[in-house]
Amino acid sequence: MLLAIDAGNTEVTLGLFSGEDLERSWRITTRPDRTADEWAVMLRALFQEAGLDITETDRSILASVVPLATEAIADGVVIATGTVPTIVTAANLPIRLEVDEPLTVGADRMVNTLAASRLFGVDTIVVDFGTATTLDCITKDGRFLGGIIAPGIRTAGENLVRRAAKLSATELGPPERAIGKRTDECIRAGLVFGAADAVDGMVRRIKAEWPTREVPKVIATGGLAPLVAKFSAEIEEVHPDLTLQGLRLASQWLAQGGGR
């Protein structure tokens, strides 16, 4: 069994794979101050609650964009499972980073594009709705071309509420209309329609600059992807577990001798 962990700025997503099948996944709030022992206790509790035997885990892999949490998570995995997690870096993935500063590309972006190139086999734009909304570009032959980083939907909403005294937090959901009749409706429409229209506009700009003759496929991932995709003209498919699948593919490639 493979334990795949994606440590993001807002959430840590964990997935347990049996072969190619994702047996179970969890989402936990990111807390950089958690210790390795706390992570071990949490992992054991999650497995126990799901009726799973954590000792059956024989491999683990970690992609993290939270440096302060990386070591504690990795050590917690060692304590709980007895496996030493592979830490994803640009050096151990089968993609070519055709960017000016490859060391600054987040591990989550790299595994997303790895998954896209391996699972779909065509030029792809991956839209990931997380703390930031990222649009990443990968060719079918594994060339990472770069992309766009924009404020995430929840990040934008929280910042709006924090800076506007008369606005309060609003639950995200499908807006009923563009012209809101209540303040919460107005905020919801602004966040969701704004995100969808922004993504559509950015995708069109990316397509206009695409360096090959192919029209790239547009897929979305992240917790809010199903919501925003309903209102997007450019997003073709939603794959909520794309990052975990990318981690599975990375682990598989490394286990077969890749990266040496």
For each feature predicted by the language model, list its residue ranges.
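Short hydrophobic/aromatic-enriched beta-strand-loop microsegments
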Residues: 24, 81-88, 144-149, 235-244
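Phosphate-binding/catalytic loop of phosphoryl-transfer enzymes
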Residues: 75, 83-163, 192-205, 227, ...
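Short amphipathic alpha-helical segments
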Residues: 16-17, 73-76, 138-140, 231-233
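ATP-binding/phosphotransfer module of carbohydrate and carboxylate kinases, centering on a glycine-rich
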Residues: 2-4, 30, 157-260
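Phosphate-bearing ligand-interacting subdomains
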Residues: 47-78
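Short glycine-aspartate micro-motif
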Residues: 2-6, 61, 124-128, 219
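Short glycine-rich, Thr/Ser-proximal phosphate-binding strand/loop in the N-terminal lobe
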Residues: 2-48, 142-168, 173-177
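Phosphate/pyrophosphate-binding loops at sites that engage ATP/ADP/AMP, CoA/4′-phosphopantetheine
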Residues: 43-58, 202-216
